[in-house]
Amino acid sequence: MSGGRDSSTSSGSNSAAPGASTNATSSASASASSTSTSASPGSTTSPASTQRQRGRPAKRATCTWCGEGKLPLQYVLPTQTGKKEFCSETCIAEFRKAYSKGACTQCDNVIRDGAPNKEFCSIMCMNKHQKKNCSTRHSGGSASGKGLAESERKLLASGAPAPTGPFQYESFHVFDWDAYLEETGSEAAPAKCFKQAQNPPNNDFKIGMKLEALDPRNVTSTCIATVVGVLGSRLRLRLDGSDSQNDFWRLVDSTEIHAIGHCEKNGGMLQPPLGFRMNASSWPGYLCKILNNAMVAPEEIFQPEPPEPEENLFKVGQKLEAVDKKNPQLICCATVDAIKDDQIHVTFDGWRGAFDYWCNYRSRDIFPAGWCARSCHPMQPPGHKSRMDSSSSKQRCPRPRYTVVAESEAMVPASPATAHFHPNCKGGPFINNSKLPCMVTGPTYQTLAKLCLQEVLAASTDTQQLSKLLFALEGDVHIVTAAGKNFTVKIPSPMRMKDDESLAQFIETLCTTCRACANLISLVHETEECKKCANSRKRQLTQSATPPSSPVLADKRNRQSNSATTSPSEKIIKQELAVKSPVESKSKTSTNNGKEPASQQNSNHSLNNNNNSASKSSNKVVIKSEPNGANAQTSSTTQALRKVRFQHHANTNTNSSATNGNQDTSQTTHVSTSHCSSSSTSSSTSLAGGSANTSTIGKYLAPLVAEVHPEQANVKPSNSYYKSPTTLSSSASLPTSVSTPFTGCQSASSTALAAGGVTAAKAATAPAGAAATAGASPSYTAITSPVSTPTSALANSHLRSQPIDWTIEEVIQYIESNDNSLAVHGDLFRKHEIDGKALLLLNSEMMMKYMGLKLGPALKICNLVNKVNGRRNNLAL
C-alpha cells in the first residue's frame, strides 16, 4: 500500500481542508477511489516505509477484517490509532458494523464473538493493557477514556462528518502552492487559461443516483450511469450493464452528463454500454428494471459548463494541477513542458516521463493551482525520484527503473514530433495512399516512427509482403498493431534517433523500402504538390486523353518509353506476326536509287526470320516504320482518310502488293484488329498456301481496320485521294497507333464505306522475301494487337462450360485469372477441396468462419461466384 496514496496524517494534520463538503466524506467507495494502490504521479513514500530499509523485511500487510494477504489492499479507514487497510468494500463495511458495537481498548480492533472480555479482542491485549495501566485501572480517567471511544465509534458508524475528529473518512494535507512556487522559482498558470469555473461548482450528487452519460469508449452512445463515488467537484460513474473495470470520472459541470430524460427530449435513444454483459435484445427490459424506483439525480444539481478561453494562453514552465490519465482518481502537481498550436504537454513534477501526455488547452482534466483545495479534492504532491531507489518503493511502485531508457532525454523533443503524409504522392505497389491520414503526432521520435509504420501497414494492400520488408530494416524489434493484426517491425534504437535529421533519414528509408515516392512522408507540411508525381500524373492524363485509347495503345507507349533507355540493337523486338500495311498515299518522295546499306539488309533479314519463327503463337503486330533519313526522305501531304477496312481472302494478290515497296509515307495509321470468335474453314484453307505471315494472319481470321491520319503539317486535301487496297504497297511503312478494336467478325459486305468513297478490298500481304528488297529503315515499333486475348479471358477459355464440373485446379485457375490478389488463397482452396460444386455453395460467412478468410477477400470471391452463377443460368437458357 503506497503511503502517498493513503495520505496518512498525524494527529496535528488530521483535519480536512476548510469548507470540506459532506459528500467528500460520506461513503466507503469514495475512499476506495481516492486510496488506490497503483503508483502514480504524486504518490509519496510514508515515513514508516523509509525507516524499514535495513534489517528484517517488513511484515506483509493483510486485510484487517478477513486477513487476506494476496489481494491488494485498496481501501483505507483512518482511526485514532492509525489506519485500517481492507481488500474490498465488503470487508470495510463489515468492519464498520462490528466496530460500532465495540472495539478493543488496547489495539482498537473489533471484538469478535468468543472474546475473553467485552473490552479486549484477545487475552494478549488484555494482559498488555493491565501491565500498562495497572496503577490507574480503577481511576475515573479510564472510564472517561472509554466513554470518548464509544462516542467516536457511534460517530463513525453514523457516517456523519467530523471536521476535527480523528475518524473523518477522507483526510488529506492541503498542498502549499505558495511555498512550492517560491521554492521552484516558477509561476502558476492564471485561471483565464483554463476551461474551469472561477469557483469550483457545488457537488450535490449522492452515491446511488442515476443519470445519463456519454459512453467514454463510444461517445456517440448515451447510456444510464450510476454515481459510485463523490470526490470534491468530481463524480465517479459506472455505466449500468458494465463492470467496475470501466469506471470513469466527470466534473459536475460537464456537458457529458445530463438528467434522466434529456436524451429522449432531444430525439435520441438510450443505448447499452460498450461491453454490455447481457444479451442486447434484453436491453429494453433491463432499462425499465434499473429505472424503476431508482434514485434519479434532479436536474437542478447539474451545473452549466464554464466558458472556454479564446486562445491558448499557456506558457512553458507554468504550474498547474492535472488529472493522472492512468489513475484518473488522482489530481497531481504538473508543469506545462511544451506548447504546439492548441496542444500542451503536461508533465508531472517529480516523476519520470511515463505518465506525461498531450492535451488540448480546453481540456477539463487540467485545473489552476489551488483548485483542489477550494473544491475539497485531495491533491497529490510532487513525487521524489530519489525514493524510487529504496527497497520499499520498488515493491510498492509498479514503475520499473529501466523504463527511463525508453523515455530518455535524447528521445523527447521540445515539442511533439509530427509526420505529414501526402496522399497525392505515389504509394508504390504496397500502399494505398488514399487510406493514409494527413498527419500523425508522437511525443517522442521513436513513438512517431512506430506510428508511421503502423499507418503504412494499415494502408497496405499486401501486409504480408510489406511486413517482411519492414522487418528487414535495421534497429530494435517492436510489435505494432494495424488492421487488427500484430506485425513485427524494426525501428532504429533510441541512441540513433536523437534529432529530426535521424528521424528524416528513417522516414526516407521507409519510403524507399515501400517503393513509394520519397515525399510521401515528411516532417514538414508541404502545401505544394510533389513535382515528380505531378509530372507523372500529367503524362498519364495526356496519354489517357489522346483518342482513341485502348490497352494496345498503352502497351505501345510503355514500349516506346522503355526503348529510350535501350540500345539500338535492343529496339528490334521479337514479334509473332508481321503485318504489312496495304495503304499507300500519293506523295512526292525523293529516294536514293543506290543500294541499300548492309545494316538495313541485315535488319530486314532478321525481321523476316523472326516473323517465320514466331508465326505459330502470334499475339503482336510489328509495323516497320521508316523515319526521314539520309537514304530516304519523305514530304508527303495527304488528306485524312476516314477509315479503310479490309479483309483477308484466299485470292489475295501478294505480287501486286510488292510492286510499290519503295514508296514511303509519313502518315499516322491507327491499326485495330479484333479476334473473331467464329472460324471460317474456307478462308483458313485458302491462306495455307501463302507465306508464313499470310498463314498466320489467316489463322485468326480477324478483319484489320486501318485508320489513317496525316501529319498536322503540310496538309493538302487536293493532293490526297484513296487508293484501292489491292494497289497499295504492302511494304509502305506507317507509324502506327491503335484504335478501338472491333468486337466481332465482319463480313465482306459490312466493310464497305459508301460515304467516304472508301471501298472494301482484299488484304495484300507481301511474301517473306519482299521485306528484304524494300527500301525500308531498320527501326521497328512493336505494338500489341487486339488479336491477343486478355489473360483472364484466355485462361477462362480453357475452363469447362459448366462450372459445376470444374475441378479444384480449375476453380483456382478461374479465381486467379479474374483477380491476381486472390492467388495467395490457392492453397486454401486445395486444403478445403473446393471444386465447382463447392464453389457455387460458398458465401462470405462460410469462408470467414471455416476458411479463415478476411471480409475483403471473401466478398471478392462471392462476387466471382455470383458471376459464375449468372453465366450458368445463361447457359441453361
Curated annotation (Swiss-Prot):
GO biological process, any: follicle cell of egg chamber stalk formation
Effect the entry attributes to changing residue 834 to T: Complete loss of function. Significant loss of self-binding activity. Moderate loss of ph-p binding activity
Record keywords: Chromatin regulator, Developmental protein, Metal-binding, Nucleus, Phosphoprotein, Repeat, Repressor, Transcription, Transcription regulation, Zinc, Zinc-finger
PROSITE patterns with a match to the protein in the record: MBT, SAM_DOMAIN, ZF_FCS
Subunit: Scm associates with the PRC1 core complex containing PSC, PC, PH and Sce/RING1. Forms homotypic and heterotypic interactions. Interacts with the SAM domain of ph-p via its SAM domain in vitro. Interacts with corto in vitro.
Keyword Ribonucleoprotein attributed: no
Domain SAM, first and last residues per copy: 806-876
Main subcellular location of this protein, as a coarse class: nucleus
GO MF term set: chromatin binding; histone binding; identical protein binding; PRC1 complex binding; sequence-specific DNA binding; zinc ion binding
Any one Pfam family match given in the protein's UniProt record, by short name: zf-FCS
Name listed for the protein in its UniProt record: Polycomb protein Scm
MBT repeats: 175-273, 281-382
GO cellular component annotations of the record: nucleus; polytene chromosome
Subcellular location: Nucleus
Effect caused by changing residue 836 to S: Loss of self- and ph-p binding activity
Skewed-composition ranges (Polar residues): 560-569
Gene giving rise to this polypeptide: Scm
Domain notes: The SAM domain is essential for function.
Ribosomal protein is among the record's keywords: no
Effect of mutating residue 854 to A: Partial loss of self- and ph-p binding activity
Biological function: Polycomb group (PcG) protein. PcG proteins act by forming multiprotein complexes, which are required to maintain the transcriptionally repressive state of homeotic genes throughout development. PcG proteins are not required to initiate repression, but to maintain it during later stages of development. They probably act via the methylation of histones, rendering chromatin heritably changed in its expressibility.
Mutagenesis or variant effect for residue 860 to R: No effect on function. Shows self- and ph-p binding activity comparable to wild-type
Residues with the Phosphoserine modification: 549-550, 585
Zinc finger (FCS-type): 54-93
SUPFAM superfamilies from the UniProt entry: SAM/Pointed domain, Tudor/PWWP/MBT
